């Protein structure tokens, strides 16, 4: 996790230089690098991905999360906690040509550089300084902005067809975002680049990007893409960073290897959510081989350096079936260390799910799933009836340790190209195979030198012995091996395969974080597996998520020992005028007439313990407590979701709403601190935090777990806001205080909920309300028998009017 310092930097760099001249290493060759290169400078752009409960630093230079040139990282989760879970990550790619010459690109801490920005030419995989510099940026889009642009454009099309003014009425001040206008949809064909570069939706199908024709960066806002059969790459996530890299911009000073000629179109993306997905980020790499040579024994890997709070007390492990590699703490307390802030008691686990890797070599059949000949361990496309669409999953999982911490030098950081390639293939730096047990090294007395393995520390997730030549082994984790916790790194690798010129592959990974409140650190790994299953389901659904009703805008008026909370929905909200409805394509039922639409049902407002509480933690009473709930007055009150329990291995009922069923309200008086002990009255000048969400309801069929005719019923009738109309759901702060100083000393005599006296000037009827005249009107009627303009008592008039904001009365 930590970068090499002082003289160690110099030593490692010298070993890099020496490796340039190495002729043979094992079964392949490394030749001296050709000094001719494009002369590109190292990329410098850095952007924070921080839509949800994670703050992640993303670079255009090829690695992730590490603060450039510092022994510090920025993969902070929970966001605003000051605690980081990971240090850095990068792609490792390597293979040999027909002459056994190794070609490889990799990165760790950018002590050297193997990746640069910009596309390559299609023929000779060429680039230049100007091209690299031009693309040293993240092209950032949000699904909200793209959806709004599409709605604006289609409103204009509708106006032209029908002579209406919908566009100007619904979007009076709309401006097309610059990213839509300047989207890098096309490469420079004069330099031999691919005409089609960044993915875009071609509205009129003319093959050219023009936003004035309705084209836009291709977020699948209509949710029509079928990723199981469509190989094209769209943009994913509520927010997306897109950029393009290559490994031909200059000499490989990280590994010393010859370049491959790889063009890499990268994405980093995230979703705002109200569940475990709120603690995740995702990364997709489309890899196009622009090189002219076929590479054999090719491996693609994803390297991750963990820093789970204190980086010096971590363990690693993997879940073979899930394709998941993870870090967890070596004991039940994660303290502060060397400037790194720890998680404390019951520390979390963090993992990387290797969703998809490169395509398996074509063999003319649809490979199945299992351990037989040509069958897969994990991955996608196996046994789906489609020939030659199989993609590797995690085929190897390996770890190594920080060079500076006294570890076996053969199990430490790579220092030359052969080390990187050995790790990708499943060998230690000295060329010995990984073996099962102990530390995985052949001389370890607790390791079995007769059992080579592909997956280090799989626990009990490899019951068929996929990683041990079909011979099942006993449970093996770092805990069971009693290893010394250390500063770990791991690599998830896929291969071998043949990489041909022009071949297009994808690597997609998801970073998952979870925390158990139990003391044993491995309990957080179990929680991580549950969270990872949601990440896997999201990937398998093409990263399509239900939007859910947007959270309302929450405003707070501060009064003496009182806060007034008001809710509203802006015009760009999918719940404007409380009109949210959304079709759920994932509802599976044999009933063709089943109602598959969620509709707006109500609001919930929570008091939060502090600003660190995210929307995914609202069910934790130590962090969030329900202040108020209101819902449509109908036959729906209590709403139950059936949620899977790993402990019980069954779906259990969880009450999400106990509805008051009295109708929708938009303003609320709060005088009570739900986290206070003793006197619960709000205290002036104290900070309080609130968060509001909307929720929708669908119950196409009652779910009954013990009724075989009802097990296809609705398990999740309650669907809560996962985001706002723009961006994440954010808490609001309120500080009660005397309001007079902010209004020039004016005293306010009306309070929240008060109704004014109403005088009838004209009209008739009671508005379906109980009416009462004031005393003056009654006395006039008794004296004169008639009152031309009667005045009604407070709150007893024919019109229902109440004071919502006492400070906003004229």
Locations of regions flagged by a protein language model:
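Bacterial Sec-dependent N-terminal signal peptides
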Residues: 1-25, 733-736
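Extracellular/surface-associated beta-sandwich interaction domains
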Residues: 22-810
């Amino acid at each position: 996790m930590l970068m090499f310092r002082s003289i160690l930097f110099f030593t490692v760099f010298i070993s890099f230089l020496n490796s340039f001249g190495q002729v043979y290493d094992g079964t392949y060759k490394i030749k001296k690098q050709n000094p001719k290169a494009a002369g590109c400078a190292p990329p410098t752009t850095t952007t924070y991905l921080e839509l949800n409960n994670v703050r992640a630093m993303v670079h255009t230079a090829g690695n992730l999360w590490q603060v450039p040139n510092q022994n510090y990282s920025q993969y902070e989760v929970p966001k605003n906690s000051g605690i980081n879970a990971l240090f850095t990550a990068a792609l490792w790619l390597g293979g040999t040509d027909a002459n056994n010459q190794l070609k490889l690109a990799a990165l760790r801490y950018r002590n050297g550089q193997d990746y640069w920005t910009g596309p390559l030419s299609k023929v000779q995989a060429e680039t230049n300084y100007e091209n690299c510099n031009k693309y040293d940026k993240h092209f950032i889009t949000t699904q909200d902005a793209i959806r709004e642009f599409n709605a604006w454009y289609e409103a204009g099309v509708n106006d032209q067809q029908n002579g209406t003014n919908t566009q100007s009425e619904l979007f009076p001040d709309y401006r097309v975002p610059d990213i839509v206008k300047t989207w890098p949809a096309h490469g420079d064909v004069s330099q031999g680049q691919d005409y089609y570069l960044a993915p875009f939706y071609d509205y009129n199908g003319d093959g050219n990007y023009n936003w004035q024709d309705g084209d836009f960066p291709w977020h699948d806002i209509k949710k029509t893409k079928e990723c199981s059969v469509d190989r094209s790459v769209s943009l994913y996530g509520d927010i997306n960073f897109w950029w393009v890299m290559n490994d031909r911009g200059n000499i490989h000073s990280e590994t010393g290897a010859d370049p491959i000629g790889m063009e890499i179109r990268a994405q980093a993306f995230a979703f705002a959510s109200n569940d475990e997905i709120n603690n995740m980020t995702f990364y997709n790499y489309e890899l196009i081989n622009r090189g002219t040579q076929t590479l054999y024994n090719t491996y693609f890997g994803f390297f991750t350096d963990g820093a789970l709070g204190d980086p010096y007390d971590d363990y690693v492990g993997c879940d073979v079936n899930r394709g998941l590699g993870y870090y967890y703490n070596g004991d039940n307390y994660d303290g502060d260390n060397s400037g790194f802030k720890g998680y404390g008691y019951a520390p979390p686990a963090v993992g990387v799910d290797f969703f998809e890797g490169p395509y398996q070599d074509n063999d003319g059949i649809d490979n199945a799933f299992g351990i037989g000949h040509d069958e897969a361990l994990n991955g996608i496309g196996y046994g789906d009836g489609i020939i030659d669409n199989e993609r590797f999953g995690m085929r190897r999982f390996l770890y190594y340790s920080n060079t500076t911490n006294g570890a076996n030098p053969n199990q430490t950081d790579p220092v030359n190209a052969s080390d990187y390639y050995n790790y990708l293939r499943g060998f230690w730096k000295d060329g010995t195979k990984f073996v099962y047990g102990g530390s995985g090294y052949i001389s370890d007395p607790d390791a079995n030198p007769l059992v080579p393995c592909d997956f280090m520390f799989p626990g009990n997730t490899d019951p068929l012995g996929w990683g041990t030549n079909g011979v099942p082994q006993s449970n093996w984790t770092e805990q069971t091996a009693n290893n010394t916790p250390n500063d770990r790194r791991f690599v998830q690798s896929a291969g071998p395969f043949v990489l041909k010129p022009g071949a297009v592959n994808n690597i997609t990974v998801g970073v998952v974080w979870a925390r158990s409140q139990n003391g044993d650190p491995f309990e957080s790994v179990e929680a991580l597996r549950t969270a990872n299953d949601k990440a896997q389901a999201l990937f398998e659904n093409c990263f399509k998520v239900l939007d859910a009703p947007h959270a309302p805008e929450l405003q707070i008026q501060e009064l003496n020992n009182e806060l007034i909370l008001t809710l509203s929905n802006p015009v760009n909200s999918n719940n404007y005028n409380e009109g949210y409805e959304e079709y759920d394509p994932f509802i599976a039922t044999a009933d063709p007439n089943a109602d598959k639409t969620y509709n707006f049902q109500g609001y919930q407002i929570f008091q939060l313990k502090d600003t660190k509480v995210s929307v995914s933690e609202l069910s934790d009473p130590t962090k969030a407590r329900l202040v108020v709930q209101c819902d449509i007055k109908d036959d729906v009150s209590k709403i139950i979701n059936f949620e899977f329990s790993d402990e019980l291995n069954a779906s259990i009922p969880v009450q999400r709403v106990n509805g008051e069923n009295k109708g929708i309200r938009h303003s609320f008086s709060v005088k009570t601190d739900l986290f206070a002990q003793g006197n619960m009255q709000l205290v002036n000048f104290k900070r309080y935090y609130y968060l509001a969400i909307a929720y929708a309801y669908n119950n196409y069929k009652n779910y009954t777990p013990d009724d075989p005719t009802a097990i296809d019923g609705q398990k999740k009738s309650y669907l809560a806001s996962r985001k706002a109309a723009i961006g994440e759901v954010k808490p609001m702060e309120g500080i009660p205080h005397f309001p007079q100083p902010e209004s020039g000393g004016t005293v306010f005599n009306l309070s929240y909920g008060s109704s004014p006296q109403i005088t009838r000037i004209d009209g008739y009827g009671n508005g379906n309300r109980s009416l009462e005249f004031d005393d003056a009107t009654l006395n006039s009627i008794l004296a004169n028998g008639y009152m031309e303009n009667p005045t009604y008592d407070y709150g007893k008039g024919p019109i229902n009017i109440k004071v919502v904001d006492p400070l906003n009365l004229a």
